[in-house]
Amino acid sequence: MSGSPKFVSPFHRPHCLSAAAPAGQAKLTHPGKAILAGGIAGGIEICITFPTEYVKTQLQLDEKANPPRYKGIVDCVKQTVQGHGVKGLYRGLSSLLYGSIPKAAVRFGVFEFLSNQMRDESGKLDSTRGLICGLGAGVAEAVVVVCPMETVKVKFIHDQTSANPKYRGFFHGVREIVRTQGLKGTYQGLTATVLKQGSNQAIRFYVMTALRNWYKGDNPNKSINPVVTGLFGAVAGAASVFGNTPLDVIKTRMQGLEAHKYKSTVDCAIKIMKYEGPAAFYKGTVPRLGRVCMDVAIVFIIYEEVVKVLNKVWKTD
């Protein structure tokens, strides 16, 4: 009948953020879900992996000129447990926990927001665009959360291992840093942090996107087992470690209590090379490798599973 209204498929929306996409079109994740799922994943992950983060930071701060206090990873753990008990490996956890939740929330929220704009009409995101979205997510988390929180964390851990600690707790430490150094005291090493986080997430999301696309093949909505997601995450984490550990070392030095020794990020890199040699740029790689692989695997597994639950209870049509 000529007067009948023309039927328009409710699925004819290439970029709709729905829980049920048409066959052959990838489901997109609403940024709001990504923020919530990312925050949950970040909080759980850091509680599990913090001891390796503590050891990594201690080894990086243990400069050769001191002379070195620790002989290696095992010695660092041994001395810490002997002096402070097992709980000593969790000193500084509060500062990192307060930052981990919003960091992961910003990272995944920004990544999903950017990727939803850059996917093709079938909803697929190629690995190159995944790298760009990851870079954007990394820069955002660096500026909004990571730099101020990491600066406080490094100063707090460094202070707690000194002969006469002056910070009574996380919030007291923050107040003292702001009181004596101003807000800029929480933004030391911003350039190094942006470079580190940007390259970190660019590498991780590039690898994850490439592996996911390979695994799913021609079916963009093919379900991925959590174990597989974890393996992909571990590979992505390892790639990021070897790709930017030097930046991580520079960032840690720039945010430590002796950051005043360096005029800039470049000056820090030059002095490390001049006085400690190229090997110093990879100091703490082993503990960082273990932590990051576990970190990324856990975060992606929890994130993906939480998103699945949210898709059932939070409709975003």
UniProtKB/Swiss-Prot annotation:
Role: Mitochondrial electroneutral antiporter that exports citrate from the mitochondria into the cytosol in exchange for malate. Also able to mediate the exchange of citrate for isocitrate, phosphoenolpyruvate, cis-aconitate and to a lesser extent trans-aconitate, maleate and succinate. In the cytoplasm, citrate plays important roles in fatty acid and sterol synthesis, regulation of glycolysis, protein acetylation, and other physiopathological processes.
Entry membrane topology: Multi-pass membrane protein
PTM remark: Possesses a short cleavable presequence, which, however, is found to be dispensable both for targeting to mitochondria and insertion into the inner membrane. However, the presequence is required to keep SLC25A1 in a soluble state and thus in an import-competent state. Mature SLC25A1 lacking the presequence is prone to aggregation.
Pro-piece positions: 1-20
GO terms under cellular component: mitochondrial inner membrane; mitochondrion
Gene3D superfamilies assigned: Mitochondrial carrier domain
Protein localization: Mitochondrion inner membrane
Transmembrane residue ranges: 35-55, 130-150, 223-243, 294-314
GO biological process terms, semicolon-separated: mitochondrial citrate transmembrane transport; neuromuscular junction development
Single GO MF annotation: antiporter activity
InterPro entries: Mit_carrier, Mitochondrial_sb/sol_carrier, Mt_carrier_dom_sf, TXTP-like
Major location (coarse): mitochondrion
Cytoplasm is among the record's keywords: no
Renumbered ranges of Solcar repeats: 29-117, 128-214, 224-309
Annotated catalysed reactions: (S)-malate(in) + citrate(out) = (S)-malate(out) + citrate(in); D-threo-isocitrate(in) + citrate(out) = D-threo-isocitrate(out) + citrate(in); citrate(out) + succinate(in) = citrate(in) + succinate(out); cis-aconitate(in) + citrate(out) = cis-aconitate(out) + citrate(in)
Phenotype of the disrupted gene, per the record: Morpholino-injected embryos display altered tail morphology, impaired swimming and defective touch-evoked escape responses. Neuromuscular junction development is abnormal and motor axon terminals show short and erratic outgrowth toward the muscle fiber with no evidence of complete synapse formation. In addition, knockdown embryos often show edema of the hindbrain, heart, yolk sac and tail.
Record's keyword terms, sorted: Antiport, Membrane, Mitochondrion, Mitochondrion inner membrane, Repeat, Transit peptide, Transmembrane, Transmembrane helix, Transport
One Pfam family from the record: Mito_carr
Family per similarity comment: Belongs to the mitochondrial carrier (TC 2.A.29) family.
UniProt-recorded name of the protein: Tricarboxylate transport protein B, mitochondrial
